[in-house]
Amino acid sequence: MFDNLSERLERSFKILKGEGKITEINVAETLKDVRKALLDADVNYKVAKGFTDTVKEKALGQNVLTAVKPSQLMVKIVHDELTALMGGETAELVLEGRPAVILMSGLQGSGKTTFSGKLARMLKTKKNRKPLLVACDVYRPAAIEQLRVLGEQIEVSVYSELDSKNPVQIALNAIHEAKAKGYDLVIVDTAGRLAIDEQMMNEIEAIKKAINPDETLFVVDSMTGQDAVNTAREFNERLDFNGVVLTKLDGDTRGGAALSIRTVVNKPIKFVGTGEKLDAIDQFHPARMADRILGMGDIVSLVERAQEQYDEEEAKRLQKKIAKNQFDFNDFLSQIHQIKKMGNLKELASMIPGVGKAIKDIDIDDNAFKSIEAIIYSMTPQERTNPEILNGTRRTRIAKGSGTSIQEVNRLLKQFDQTRKMMKMVTGSKMGKMMPKLKK
C-alpha cells in the first residue's frame, strides 16, 4: 500500500538535503517531483496541483529555524497537508436511531457485501451492538447466499425475502423486524451493477427515502483509481452519502483514490478494507495514513491491533508459566495464533517506522507459520509440554509427520529456546507490565 508513492516522495525531499535555506528555486524543483509522484499514483490532476500549490505557499511563507533543516520542514508541511487532504479528523459513524440504520451503496464487485459483514462484526464486538444484516439485492440469489454465509460466520442474523422483488419493501420489513426483535442496528446491503445506470440509482434513492438511514456509505474498490473517484462523484450527486469505504487497500493500489476522493466529493473516508479476513477492516485515520505514506509507520494502529487480541487472563496465566520457566509449545502455538489474527505479516511490519521501505521487495510469506504449526501438531502432548525430551529419534519422527526436514525442526527448537529466554527476561522487567497499562 502506497509503497511506490512513499519511495518517490522520499526521493523528492532529498533535493532539499544539504540546502541551507528554502528558496523559490529548490521548492519549485522539489514540488515538481512531488506533483509527478502524485499523478503517477493516480491522484486527480486538480487535487495534485492544489496540493502542491498549498505546500509551496506554506513552505515559502515560513522562516526555517537553524535547528530545522529545509528537508525536515518540507516533510512536516507535506505531512500536514496530506492529513488535511484526506479529511484531517477521523470521521465517526453517527448511529442515533433505534434501531440505527446503515445503507450500503456501490457498484457490483466493490466488496460491498463482504464489507457489510465486516462492519457488522466490528460493531458487534467493539461497540456491543446487536446488528441485523439485510439482503436487498433481489437480482442475484448468490449475493443473498453470500450474506447468509457471512452472517453464519460472524453469528449475526440475516433478513431476506427470497420470493420478493421489491427491495424497498424488504428494507422496511427488515426494520420492522429489528424493532420487534430488539436489534439496535440494521445494515442494508443493496444491489450493485457493473456500471452506473438509471434503474440502479432510482432504486437505491427510493430505498434511502423510505428508510431514512442514519448513515449512507459508498463502498468502492480502491484499485480502480480515478474510476473510483468518478463513480463516487456520481453516487454522491444522487445519494448525498455520509462517507466512503475504500476496499482492497492492501492490494497493488497506487493510492490515488484515497488521496483524491475527500476533495472531489467533500465527504470523508470512514473505513478501509485491508484484506479478505472478516476482521480486516480499519477505521480511517488521515494523520496515521499520512504517516504511512511518508514512511513513518503507524505504531498507534499496530498497538490497537495488539490490544484487540490481548486477553488479560491468558496473559496472567502465561506470565506465571514464563516466571517458572514452564513456557511450552502449547503456549508458543497460542502466541502464533494471536499474531495471525492481527493481520498479514508484511502489513504489520510496515506499521513499524523505517521497516516498510526495508521490506518493500522482500516476500514475507504468511504460510511460514503453517510449517511451524505442522511441526508442533506432529509432537505428542508430552513433547509439547516437555521440549527437553526431543532427542534425535523424536525429531526425525516429527519431521516426517509434518512434511518438513530435520533442519527445520532443529531451527524451530532453537527459535523456541531463544523465545523462552527472551520472554523470561521481559517478564522480569517493566516491559512485562506494559500491555495491562495500555489496556487501561
Which residues are covered by each model-predicted region?
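Residue-level recognition of specific faces of alpha-helices
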Residues: M1, I15-G18, A37, V47, ...
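Short, small-residue-enriched loops and turns at beta-alpha junctions
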Residues: G109-S110, Y139-P141, K165-P167, G192-I196, ...
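Amphipathic alpha-helical interaction segments
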Residues: E29, D33, G50, T54, ...
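Conserved phosphate-handling catalytic cores of large alpha/beta enzymes
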Residues: A171-I175, Y183, A195, Q199-K209, ...
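Residue-level signature of catalytic and energy-coupling elements of molecular machines
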Residues: L16, D42, V78, L107, ...
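Long amphipathic alpha-helical segments used for membrane anchoring, targeting, substrate engagement
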Residues: F2-E19, R288-K440
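Primarily NTPase-proximal linker/entry elements flanking Walker-type ATP/GTP-binding cores
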Residues: R8-C136, A143-S164, A171-T190
